[in-house]
């Protein structure tokens, strides 16, 4: 491995850490400001009613759920809708960390009582020009990924 390749790998890892931290910061801020829609069904309803208010779509899934055909169909439809409406999309793994960030009670995680965290929408109402550092960072990452022909970038949330 050449020095340039080594530096590029290090930069990519550092960029991934920065984007992951930005996503975490963004989710917490969006939830605090009531700008977060949680759940596949709830997200589909919002995108049907007001797609212009959606600025980011997070599709969350862990490896053990990859074989869930119904969930994959939902994701495909949501991704298509997001692409048609110029909404940034990020695939996320680390459902436990996601639940932790959103304040899900530990006893409900993985049960039927737990909220559906597979699809999260961050909204920005038309009357408000909300900008957060996290949103800018994630949008930049999405744009950069599209430039590299990775239409749905992927990040992994690490448990803490």
From Swiss-Prot:
Gene3D superfamilies: 3.30.1330.30. Keywords: Apoptosis, Developmental protein, Differentiation. It comes from the Eukaryota. One of its GO terms (cellular component) is cytoplasm. GO terms for biological process: apoptotic process; cell differentiation; positive regulation of apoptotic process; positive regulation of JNK cascade; positive regulation of p38MAPK cascade; regulation of cell cycle. InterPro entries: GADD45 (IPR024824), Ribosomal_eL30-like_sf (IPR029064), Ribosomal_eL8/eL30/eS12/Gad45 (IPR004038). Interacts with GADD45GIP1. Belongs to the GADD45 family. Involved in the regulation of growth and apoptosis. Mediates activation of stress-responsive MTK1/MEKK4 MAPKKK. This is Growth arrest and DNA damage-inducible protein GADD45 beta. It comes from Homo sapiens. The lineage of its organism: Eukaryota, Metazoa, Chordata, Craniata, Vertebrata.
């Amino acid at each position: 491995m050449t020095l340039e390749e080594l530096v590029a790998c290090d930069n990519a890892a550092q960029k991934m850490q920065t984007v992951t931290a930005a996503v975490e910061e963004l989710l917490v801020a969006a939830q605090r400001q009531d700008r977060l829609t949680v759940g596949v069904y709830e997200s589909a309803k919002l995108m049907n009613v007001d797609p212009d208010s959606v600025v980011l779509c997070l599709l969350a899934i862990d490896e053990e759920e990859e074989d869930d055909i119904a969930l994959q169909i939902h994701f495909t439809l949501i991704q298509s809708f997001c692409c048609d409406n110029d909404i940034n999309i990020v695939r996320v793994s680390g459902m436990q960390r996601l639940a932790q960030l959103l304040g899900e009670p530990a006893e409900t995680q993985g049960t039927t009582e737990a909220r559906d965290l597979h699809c999260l929408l961050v909204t920005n109402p038309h009357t408000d020009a909300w900008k957060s550092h996290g949103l800018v960072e994630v949008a930049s990452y999405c744009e950069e990924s599209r430039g590299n022909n990775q239409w749905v970038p992927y990040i992994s949330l690490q448990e803490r």
